[in-house]
Amino acid sequence: MDVNIAPLRAWDDFFPGSDRFAQPDFRDISKWNNRVVSNLLYYQTNYLVVAAMMISVVGFLSPFNMILGGIVVVLVFTGFVWAAHNKDALRRLKKRYPTTFVMVVMLASYFLISMFGGVMVFVFGITFPLLLMFIHASLRLRNLKNKLENKMEGIGLKRTPMGIVLDALEQQEEGINRLTDYISKVKE
């Protein structure tokens, strides 16, 4: 299946008035996770642009450490995803606690980069954009268009880069399973 790049959303959609932002319900982790995944899919190109701008600024100031940090993060993430597919304990951790899994990847990357002395570049160039994405995705309420786009991605009508990353973290399967359960209930 072809991978489609999601469109760049309008700035007033990405950052509307304060009425479209709300604190997530921390007691209902699955609902919060659903909001984050939905927003990551819907605003993925906006997140990529913001992260690219931040990475470019930090990379301009310290190019070697930025390239080193990027390589380490990609290698550690790939290694953890590979290990999680081959070890059941890691697979369960990744599926049940995706945020913890990403934090472990970031901490492992941090310790590897600290051996080379580029920790501040790592913090501001790589981790800070990820933190901003997570905060925005957690606080931004979804609209109808967002929900529709996510359903299309969930049932396989569209395939995007963020969808591939979320599949690697096993965050898409749950939504597809819920959708198929709903469809089978409707048929009955």
Curated annotation (Swiss-Prot):
GO BP terms in the entry: negative regulation of L-glutamate import across plasma membrane
Topological domains, Cytoplasmic: 1-35, 78-93, 136-188
Entry GO CC: cytoskeleton; endoplasmic reticulum membrane; plasma membrane
Record carries keyword Endoplasmic reticulum: yes
Domain of life from the UniProt record: Eukaryota
Ranges for region Required for homodimer formation and heterodimer formation with ARL6IP1: 103-117
Annotated transmembrane regions: 36-56, 57-77, 94-114, 115-135
Endoplasmic reticulum listed as a keyword: yes
Pfam families: PRA1
InterPro entries: Prenylated_rab_accept_PRA1
UniProt feature coiled coil, ranges: none
Membrane topology: Multi-pass membrane protein
Region (Targeting to endoplasmic reticulum membrane): 136-188
Modified positions (N-acetylmethionine) in chain numbering: 1
Keywords from the UniProt entry: Acetylation, Cell membrane, Cytoplasm, Cytoskeleton, Endoplasmic reticulum, Membrane, Transmembrane, Transmembrane helix
Subcellular localization(s) per the UniProt record: Endoplasmic reticulum membrane; Cell membrane; Cytoplasm; Cytoplasm, Cytoskeleton
Subunit structure: Homodimer. Heterodimer with ARL6IP1. Forms multimers. Interacts with ARL6. Interacts with prenylated RAB1A and RAB3A. Interacts with SLC1A1/EAAC1. Interacts with RTN2 (via first transmembrane domain). Does not interact with VAMP1, VAMP2 or VAMP3.
Family, similarity comment: Belongs to the PRA1 family.
Job of this protein: Regulates intracellular concentrations of taurine and glutamate. Negatively modulates SLC1A1/EAAC1 glutamate transport activity by decreasing its affinity for glutamate in a PKC activity-dependent manner. Plays a role in the retention of SLC1A1/EAAC1 in the endoplasmic reticulum.
Name the UniProt record assigns to this protein: PRA1 family protein 3
